Amino acid sequence: MPNYNIAKTGKQTQAVKLLKDNKTVCLFGGSRSGKTFIALFAVVLRAINYIGTRHLVIRFRFSHAKQSICYDSMPDVLKVLKADTRVKLNKSDWFYEFPNGSTIWIGGLDDKERTEKILGNEFASIFLNEASQVSYDSHEMLTTRLNPPVGIKPLYIIDYNPPGKTHWGYSIFELRKFPDGRPVPEGDYARLKMNPHDNRENLSNDYIEGTLANLSAAKRKRFLDGDYGDDIGTLWRREWIRYQRQPDDLQRVVVGVDPTGSAGGDECGIVVSASDGVEYYVLDDYSLHGTPSEWAQAV
């Protein structure tokens, strides 16, 4: 059996323990802090140790997944594990094939046809990379595909540079509440903050003081300090929102649509709201990344 005890930072060692002990783990923090590397390390080890299993690494955009995972982080992980000559990347269907029959699939949620094909399968591990770009609906959909063979612990990993406090990740891992108000189960949904200072030994001498320290205050907070943003400029504050049952005497129900106008394809906001004449209620949120025809179908 090869020796897979690679050199890790202190925070990466903590991350490995969390990944062993929990089903769902969020690794969050500043830029270049070693989050993605250690998450991929865990997924690759599981592919090696659990013969013939299937695993998924996915981002919002498939092109970004190919660039950041296949051409950047994954080669480094396979090299330190001395598996780079034994694990093959299939560039037709974009999956890594291991000698023991295990596979790691690479996906992007923006590629609808490919995503549907991939998500027709079930996985022993799922790594949602840069989850700050991903909707809660997509996250929930991914969790339904986490179903390993009997006897293998499922593992769902999320990582991101912390987004604003309105993001579902803040609600789940910091407030310990799902977006619909249900409490998060005790004993799972672990989180670990990993910042550039924790990974200093693997960074260039000038990266922290010369690059990150000179960012604007908001970007320093996110990419250097690894803190969630305050969503300055938003219409609503999280503390204004209360979760409760829908009343029976609603007087008016409205479907609001806010199409995206950006070239980058931001989410189209689609919300069902109502009023009983005194208070206002959000009944459902169908916001999505998609084409105008997909917006229309959702409405």
Regions found by a protein language model. Name each.
Residues 1-24, 258:
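Pre-P-loop entry segment of helicase/translocase ATPase cores
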Residues 36-50:
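Walker A/P-loop NTP-binding motif
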Residues 53-65:
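Conserved RecA-like ASCE P-loop NTPase motor core of nucleic-acid helicases/translocases
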Residues 66, 70-124:
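Inter-Walker segment of RecA-like/P-loop motor cores
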Residues 129-130, 259:
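Walker B catalytic acidic pair
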Residues 133-202, 207-210:
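ASCE P-loop NTPase helicase motor core
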Residues 200-257:
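ATPase catalytic-site recognition across NTP-hydrolyzing enzymes
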Residues 264, 271-299:
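Nucleic-acid-processing active sites and adjacent nucleic-acid-binding tracks
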